Amino acid sequence: MNTPAQNITQDIVARLWNLCNVLKDDGVTYHQYVTELTYLLFLKMAKETNTEAQLPDGYRWDDLESKSAPERLDFYRKALIHLGNNGSLLVREIFTNASSFIKKPNTLSILVTEIDKLDWYNARREGMGDLYEGLLEKNANEKKSGAGQYFTPRPLIDSMVAVMQPTLEDIIQDPAAGTGGFLIAANRYIRENSTPDTWTETQQRKYRRNTFYGMEFVQYTHRLALMNLMLHGLD
């Protein structure tokens, strides 16, 4: 039986996934939909988590939402290009070579409206990372998306991490990181099996700068991994 927190996360993931039907008329594939959703969710989640300082002024969620439907799509397309060249390093990497697959202004307006209507209070409380990872899992389980090769099921990841028993003294590297699941699980294991509040300054510095490394050459997947890692506190 699921916990209330899991039910909340699953409900939000289901609502987000169902929005892919909005894009069918635009000929958008499943993996293109998740990419599109990543752009929009990044802006919305930055607002909800009070981290909009990493985004340049004038290119944030409220700026997108405030545009009238006819001009919103044009603004959004220009914003993707702008964000790929401005803002924090993470912002620039996530939006590198970003472009929209949306063709109709009304389609974008529906997505913005529906995303804004989600239960963001409980999403913040239960964790943005689990929400986004649930969306990635949904995409991986959809055979038509072809994304399964980049997403390893969490039970398998957790089992492998439990066998390896990583510690803060280790260096964790995933040379084919996919959407970042192994790195996230290793980080969770380390923190749950130690007392981060008692780490020395040297240990904290090592944790932040010299513990987790990942490589992913497919840009689409690399983009998703960066978003996933950021929402789990690894950036």
State where each predicted segment sits.
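Conserved S-adenosyl-L-methionine
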Residues: 146-235
